């Protein structure tokens, strides 16, 4: 009995130690572990991720009080560079990212889908070697109905001095990304990121005010039951995409899930498997999603988890944009499910 008791004690202690290790693994510590370095570059990237986390905390706090505060719900009455009506939360979140990175000393430029041109921070530009590209609020239409939203981010190394202020060095493929990820504002606030060494998730512990490691080296299933697409656009798509939708309707084992916030849908697919689709339409074959701020960051992350991302014809990470706000179709998720969609599209061409 004594030996059995000792064995049980050891098992409990090991379990407790693992839980403590996880609880002590903050985002900044994890980044340094992933880079296996305490060099100046590694410290800079750790600081950058901390700044992104701070922006996420501020946005999460604002969203948690959305029904109690002025200036959170509804539209501003303005239209952004994409021709879309601007929500008040879009403006707030965009301003949060700018304010947070103004103080970092690490970022010279921020490029957002809410801004016509990159935002330069002159005092940072002599030393700031990085550019942050981001979608401050994904799914902002969900704000007024208290549904999940997200933020998407990508970090790139600045190339050249960008003396003409055109940010032409950003017009490169998605494989130039150093890091990418998203923040999900749901029942809990989660930050999921990759630096090219796997995909890792963190959950905001409100009592500590820290993002704590939830899961390391997440792998997306090769196949999943979920397909996530706005079927309200059915008659606007090419016939090949409509044929795919008819296929999943008549094939047992598929289930539709679509929230109106891509980050939320992508997170479900990362965990459960499946495919997210935002195809182009007959009138707008280039699609709706922004390559640099939405499609490429999520493609980098999903591919690091063992999934795939494509336009239907070309790997998303191989697409070279011709302009900052370039749009692209997106099919992303489990590799078998993405391949199935591709087969319909490519046969349709």
Swiss-Prot record:
EC annotation from Swiss-Prot or TrEMBL: 3.1.3.11
Pfam families referenced in this protein's UniProt entry, alphabetically: FBPase (PF00316), FBPase_C (PF18913)
Top-level taxonomic group: Bacteria
Cellular compartments annotated: Cytoplasm
SUPFAM superfamilies: Carbohydrate phosphatase
GO BP: any one term: gluconeogenesis
Residues the record lists as binding substrate: 138-141, 230, 258, 288
Name of this protein: Fructose-1,6-bisphosphatase class 1
Source organism of the structure: Nostoc sp. (strain PCC 7120 / SAG 25.82 / UTEX 2576)
Gene behind this protein: fbp
């Amino acid at each position: 009995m004594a030996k059995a008791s000792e064995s049980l004690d050891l098992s409990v202690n090991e379990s407790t130690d693992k839980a403590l290790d996880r609880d002590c693994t903050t985002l900044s510590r994890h980044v340094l572990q992933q880079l296996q370095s305490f060099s100046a570059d590694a410290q800079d990237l750790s600081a950058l991720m901390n700044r992104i986390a701070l922006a996420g905390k501020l946005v999460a706090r604002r969203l948690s009080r959305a029904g109690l505060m002025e200036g959170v719900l509804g539209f501003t009455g303005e239209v952004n560079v994409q021709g879309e009506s601007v929500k008040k939360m879009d403006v707030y979140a965009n301003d949060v990212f700018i304010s947070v990175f103004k103080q970092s000393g690490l970022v010279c430029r921020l490029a957002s889908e809410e801004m016509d041109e990159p935002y330069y921070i002159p005092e940072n530009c002599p030393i700031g070697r990085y550019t942050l590209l981001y979608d401050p609020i994904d799914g902002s239409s969900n704000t007024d109905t208290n549904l999940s939203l997200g933020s998407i981010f990508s970090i790139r190394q600045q190339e050249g001095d960008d003396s003409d202020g055109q940010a032409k060095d950003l017009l490169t493929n998605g494989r130039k990304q150093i890091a990418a990820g998203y923040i999900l504002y749901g029942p809990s606030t989660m930050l999921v990121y990759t630096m090219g060494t796997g995909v890792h998730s963190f959950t905001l512990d409100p009592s500590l005010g820290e993002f704590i490691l939830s899961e390391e080296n997440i792998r997306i299933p090769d196949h999943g039951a979920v397909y996530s697409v706005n079927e309200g656009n059915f008659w606007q798509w090419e016939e090949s995409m409509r044929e795919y939708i008819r296929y999943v309707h008549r094939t047992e084992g598929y289930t539709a899930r679509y929230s109106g916030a891509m980050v939320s849908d992508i997170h479900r697919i990362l965990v459960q498997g499946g495919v997210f689709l935002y195809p182009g339409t007959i009138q707008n074959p280039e699609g709706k999603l922004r390559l640099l701020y939405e499609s490429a960051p999520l493609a980098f992350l999903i591919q690091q988890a063992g999934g795939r991302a494509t336009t239907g014809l070309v790997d998303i990470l191989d697409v070279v944009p011709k302009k900052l706000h370039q749009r692209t179709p997106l099919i992303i998720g489990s590799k078998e499910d993405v391949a199935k969609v591709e087969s319909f599209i490519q046969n349709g061409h």
